Amino acid sequence: MSTRYNARAAEPKWQKIWEERGDFLMRDDADGKPKYYVLEMFPYPSGRIHMGHVRNYTMGDVIARYKKARGFNVLHPMGWDAFGMPAENAAMEKNVHPKGWTYDNIAAMREQLKAIGLAIDWSREFATCDPEYYGHEQALFLDMLEAGLVSRKKSMVNWDPVDNTVLANEQVIDGRGWRSGALVERRELTQWFLKISDFADELLEGLDTLDRWPEKVRLMQKNWIGRSEGARVFFELENAPDGNTKLEIFTTRPDTLYGASFCALSPHHPLTQSLAKDNPALTDFIRECDRIGTSEEAIETADKMGFDTGLKARHPFIEGKTLPVYVANFVLMDYGTGAIFACPAHDQRDLDFARKYNLPVIPVVAPKDKQGAELDAFASGLAETGTDAYTGDGVAINSDFLNGLDVQSAKRAAIDRLEAKGIGEGTVNYRLRDWGISRQRYWGCPIPVIHCASCGTLPVPRDQLPVVLPDDVNFSEPGNPLDRHPSWKHVDCPKCGKPASRETDTFDTFVDSSWYFVRFTAPDAPTPTDKALADHWLPVDQYIGGIEHAILHLLYSRFFTRAMKATGHVSLDEPFAGLFTQGMVNHETYRDAEGRWVPPAEVDIETVSGKRVAKRIADGEPVIIGSVEKMSKSKKNTVDPEDIIAKYGADTARWFMLSDSPPERDVQWTDQGAEGAWRFTQRLWRMVTERQEDLAPTGTPMPTAFSEDELTLRRAAHQALAAATEDFENLRFNRAVARVYELANAVSGFTPGTPEGAFAKREALEILVQIVGPMMPHIAEECWEALGHGEPLTAAEWPVADKALLVEDSVTIAVQVNGKRRDELTIARDADRETVERAALALEKVGKAIDGKPVRKVIVVPGKIVNIVV
């Protein structure tokens, strides 16, 4: 047997064996086994996997293999999030059809993922661009339409001028499109919406049940849903255009109404738009606000800008007082009513605006400990020169009937007065807005509706689903090819039979990924779901993916599951019982003398006089070693998994990804780390294959007695097994790797001299291989076979640690003299006090420390410490 492990031969061999045996094909009726559903967020078929994929899917694979060995019926499927703009971009840039480009990429990536050795049930594979899949998605949409969960209305939208499509608020990052990076514009379009806001309370309350989700993700969703208790207040308007007699605002601080010094409208408030029709200067101001950006981040960092409309709003409590009405760039149309009253003394944005436009600052809340002259100084200082708004707790001042009340009491009293006067009411507001799902592009799921001039907007009859995308489209012009297709969009009205037209918008691709995990439970069902199977398999027990999806995909999926429950497709509320967000894969960056990025594969690094020096392999030109950053195509600091697999094997890549750092943290890919992982595979192989004569034959009964050395090895093996089992349960893969190293060292240091020792070494090696199995499955199978097993490791049950071997017979305790540590003592765990005392006093270093002085007393803390007082 070769002493060198050949990954290139072993890995395809075992992948073929697993496939032929059907080891990972999941059966719905698995003889009463408990179910376990593990799923990694499915990939976009870009054409090549990257190291982030390797890390993500390796983690899920470890769980799947471990749970299978533990006796679970494991569902571990794979599919493709296949619609989206990159395919259309490829069509325009490379003159290829999005469909062909996508399916070619899927074929390539499928082979790459198989090369990693994933325990995937490929029989359940689908792509979201399969008509079979998106036809069921269209049926779900029609179900939601019938249930009143869909609306169509005009709205201001985020328009990506590069991708020529609408973006949801969550897809606008720092004022730019999440995919194209283009500055987003605001336009009014008729859009389709899913009523996620109907589920705002449910989505918020459900977060409390997700105790296996990262707290950070739950907090991000909580903030995005944004439940706020406050008041609706109606300000009467003076000199307003016809029909605009009242201005409705929402505030969380009705207690500060006496501090109001102006009102402000969003640039996209209906009143603003009405005023702008006859005001070119206001129109220009709105355009400038749009140019700056629409996101909260962009608004937060931009200079505060305002436009005085000339309108006045009457104060609801102070007779005769009016407030100027501005249009302000920091007021969001998507929050509240798109209009605010501003209290500069107690809101920083309001204060910044007031100082810029010389508006009054009226303090109406003061700290409770401010009295008399100190209170006067606080109020006057804030009003006249203060640059920091006071946002703390306190009591109301300068507020008539509210004076002296704490903030919460003042809020309630203000709301009571508003309601009594009929000019306001207490209410709850949500930041969450309905989900705009219309996209003006070709490569997406067609929205199954028909527009008829006589009958209006109608659903496509269900017997005509799926509405399939046409293949004969032209990408030579910008915009949506479906709009200009000569025949596809022209249909007869299903109600009156007259000529009508199809909806040419397609779904936001996040719709596709909001229910795919349900379809995996019955991918061949003739309806969107097989409810019995969905109820059996869901929720997903462990979901794995990046934290960048905390709001978008994860929130949409939680909503979609509830909408599917409301339409009778599933019985649960929460789709993912456990969520794990893995860290990113990083690498050093490299630049040449001109500042151009250089890929790692083109760089050679040497250590010269203790310093790392880099040069380009092709021409020897010096290369600058830059910072360690997330692997990205833009900075060319990527490592191709195919190159790593070709050089070292998939197991090496998997091992390094699991071993280098905790899985929730970023990992830095280094050549040295990969080399170290590869060396361990060779060491493991040698440990198993060399000196097999030292091992007891397979199936040897356990001896009745062992020597102390043999027991020490057995304890090491069973303690490693118990610890690794707990590590796998808690997704602490790097710790499981550490257990493997510890046990490998224990096995390497043991040479058996008896049949009992031969048994102990075989037992330890088999446990070692079984712990390695979920993480490096190919070499584990080779080792298992070399150890004489006829069945593959995938068929073996997870070993059970012997509890008797998890407790050490001896214990090491510190020995102090007058509180200062002098030595340590290893002694039987059950030794009595007198035995411990005698052994401690007999230690040479302790004797020197006592130096003949009389011992006054000996304090023994069993199993921990001995303190000798002299």
UniProtKB/Swiss-Prot annotation:
It catalyses: tRNA(Leu) + L-leucine + ATP = L-leucyl-tRNA(Leu) + AMP + diphosphate. It comes from the Bacteria. It is found in: Cytoplasm. The keyword Repeat does not apply. InterPro entries: aa-tRNA-synth_I_CS, aa-tRNA-synth_Ia, Leu-tRNA-ligase, Leu_tRNA-synth_edit, M/V/L/I-tRNA-synth_anticd-bd, Methionyl/Leucyl_tRNA_Synth, Rossmann-like_a/b/a_fold, tRNAsynth_Ia_anticodon-bd. Its EC number is 6.1.1.4. Keywords: Aminoacyl-tRNA synthetase, ATP-binding, Cytoplasm, Ligase, Nucleotide-binding, Protein biosynthesis. A motif ('HIGH' region) lies at residues 43-53. Belongs to the class-I aminoacyl-tRNA synthetase family. This is Leucine--tRNA ligase. The lineage of its organism: Bacteria, Pseudomonadati, Pseudomonadota, Alphaproteobacteria, Hyphomicrobiales. The gene is leuS.
